């Protein structure tokens, strides 16, 4: 307990004297929390403070006192239950208490084991620990609600393409919404056999599917970029935090960023500022963030070297996506270099998923094979390769709902099998 708590327990105004009184009736290990002096642990004799094991702390900002005691106890017990020395138990306790009081909130501010070990090993130069970006990144990325070993995302968040097809077929946005519900049903029907299936769907043309998806335990990605706009434009980009605060917490914010290192300087700065603002908004609202880099656009081909340079640039800006979504490159060396670079900057990232870019399944065989040795690559987020044929035929009234679902289901299953074969 704190000095005040020991004074109450022992009935004395002097803390040491109070602890002596308590020692007469208990042989337990006593821990006294002494604020800025750290803590002192007494295993036996309590004749003076030097008889105990004192573990100091450095001065930090006390931002929030709620939960400090429980945090301290959690840290001490972490060491105690594993048979650590009392000094080590106290180091854990002090660190957990310090991190708790330096952040807003109570239990959510407590560190993960990885964060705790990092803080004890390297400390922080910040007086306000919550302003230590490295520490905050570790806190965020090691306390995620769900960790994914694989992710097979059926992406049907496309809007411009669906509107073009619907226009040619004299169909409405309501028809598109119905089709996207069929796509969701495909994902749900396969989830029993492939539990790592997820979806990417928008709330403009696919709102019904997006709402129904919440009934199932699956990964849900949701786009925030305005479809078909170049340069990059974000929905409600003037008030992103307020906008995202309305999203369910399990919706991963996805942004498709058409960017290249050889864009003109003004455009590069504009895009970087938008993505940085979006990233900060996601952290403010506790939403995970998926960054999709597209270098092949406006008649320019995919450029693997630029993808790596863009990833490097985003880390320089302090942007740490929870997921990277990368163009389908066939080069093994590219994937090796990309994963090594991501790991060196953010070892706790969820991982990388490969996008399809409307390529055929034969192409994806080569891409998946090129990624096979990289554990950081968790799967794919592919759309048109799966739904294009079914969507066009369905919008033209050439096939039924069940037929459309069968086409999409078979293609999605085949992609998953191709992925699994590349890993065997």
Model-derived features: where do they sit?
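Alpha/beta catalytic barrel-like cores
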Residues: 126-267, 320, 350, 361-371, ...
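Conserved phosphate-binding/catalytic region of the ribokinase-like
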Residues: 12-133
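Conserved, mostly hydrophobic/aromatic
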Residues: 154, 292, 324, 383
């Amino acid at each position: 307990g704190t000095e005040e708590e020991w004074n109450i327990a022992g009935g004395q105004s002097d803390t040491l004297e109070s602890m002596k009184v308590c020692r007469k009736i208990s042989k337990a290990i006593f821990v006294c929390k002494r604020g800025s002096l750290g803590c002192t642990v007494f295993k036996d004799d309590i004749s003076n403070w030097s008889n105990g094991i004192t573990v100091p702390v450095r001065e930090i900002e006390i931002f929030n006192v709620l939960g400090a005691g429980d945090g301290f106890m959690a840290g001490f017990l972490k060491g105690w239950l594993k048979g650590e020395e009392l000094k080590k138990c106290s180091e854990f306790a002090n660190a957990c208490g310090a991190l708790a009081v330096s952040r807003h909130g109570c239990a959510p501010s407590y560190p993960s084991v990885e964060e705790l070990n990092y803080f004890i090993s390297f400390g922080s130069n910040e007086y306000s620990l919550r302003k230590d970006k490295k520490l905050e990144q570790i806190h965020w990325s090691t306390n995620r609600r769900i960790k994914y070993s694989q992710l097979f995302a059926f992406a049907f968040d496309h809007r411009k393409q669906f509107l073009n097809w619907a226009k040619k077929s004299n169909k409405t946005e309501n028809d598109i919404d119905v089709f996207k519900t069929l796509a969701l049903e495909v994902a749900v029907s396969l989830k029993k056999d492939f539990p790592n299936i997820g979806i990417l769907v928008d709330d403009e043309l696919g709102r019904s599917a997006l709402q129904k998806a919440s009934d199932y335990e699956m990964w849900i990605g949701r786009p925030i970029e305005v479809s078909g706009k170049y340069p990059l434009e974000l929905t409600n980009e003037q008030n992103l935090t307020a906008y995202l605060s309305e999203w369910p917490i399990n919706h991963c914010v996805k942004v498709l960023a058409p960017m290249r290192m050889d864009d003109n300087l003004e455009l590069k700065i504009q895009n970087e500022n938008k993505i940085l603002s979006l990233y900060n908004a996601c952290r403010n609202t506790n939403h995970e963030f998926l960054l999709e880099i597209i270098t092949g656009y406006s008649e320019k081909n995919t450029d693997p070297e630029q993808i790596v340079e863009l990833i490097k640039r985003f880390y320089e800006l302090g942007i740490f996506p929870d997921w990277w979504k990368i163009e389908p490159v066939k080069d093994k060396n590219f994937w090796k270099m990309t994963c090594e670079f991501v790991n060196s900057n953010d070892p706790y990232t969820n991982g990388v998923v490969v996008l399809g870019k409307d390529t055929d399944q034969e192409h994806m065989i080569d891409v998946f094979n090129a990624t096979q040795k990289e554990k950081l690559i968790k799967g794919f987020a592919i759309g048109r390769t799966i739904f294009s044929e079914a969507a066009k035929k369905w919008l033209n009234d050439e096939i039924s709902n069940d037929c459309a679902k069968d086409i999409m289901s078979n293609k999605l299953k085949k992609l998953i099998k191709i992925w699994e074969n590349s890993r065997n």
